[in-house]
Structure formats: C-alpha cells, structure tokens
Amino acid sequence: MIRNVLLAFMICSGMTLLGGCSSVMSHTGGKEGTYPGTRASATMIGDDETNWGTKSLAILDMPFTAVMDTLLLPWDVFRKDSSVRSRVEKSEANAQATNAVIPPARMPDN
C-alpha cells in the first residue's frame, strides 16, 4: 500500500516538475506575447530541422505547456519588457539621440 502511494507520488511529482518546460523557458526572457511556450512547442513540432526525439518530447509537453501558459496569461498581459536585449536597445537608442544633437568636434588645422 505504502509502496503504491509512494510510486504514485513520484510519478505525479515528476509530471509536475517536467510539465510546461517550454512555457518556463519562454518566460525567462523578454516579453514574448501571450502563450509563448505553446507557440514555441508548435514551431518545434512543425520544424523539419527538429529531430524525432525532441519532437516527441515537445508533443508530450504540449498540454502541460498550454496549461502553464494559461495560468501565466495575466503575467504576460501586464508585465513590462525588461529583458537584457530590450534594455541594451533602449540604451543605444538614447545614446544615438544624444549623439545626433551634439555636433562633431572640429579637427585642429595643422
């Protein structure tokens, strides 16, 4: 009896920990829109360059990713884009705007 309960607990824990991998990976970056993990899994499944092992894992993970993306939908709607890439792009745009206003220095005549 205890062995069956322990086995069921281990299986459920493993499914919970492994489920929604695409969703978790997609949410670690910048703003990807809504349902980023599900879109990533669908793209991976439809890609001809993806091997059969990865496709089978993506197919197995797809329902869990869809559930995780649904649970994280409010976060996707209200979060701000604070990825490293977006911060660097914003900083470079500010630097370009500053440099456009400041005229270049004159070179001394020899």
Swiss-Prot record:
Keyword field contains Signal: yes
GO cellular component, one term: cell outer membrane
Annotated signal sequence range: 1-26
One Pfam family hit: DUF1375
Record keywords, A-Z: Signal
Region (Disordered): 87-110
Gene Ontology biological-process annotations: DNA damage response
Recorded family membership: To E.coli YceK.
Protein name per the record: Uncharacterized protein YidQ
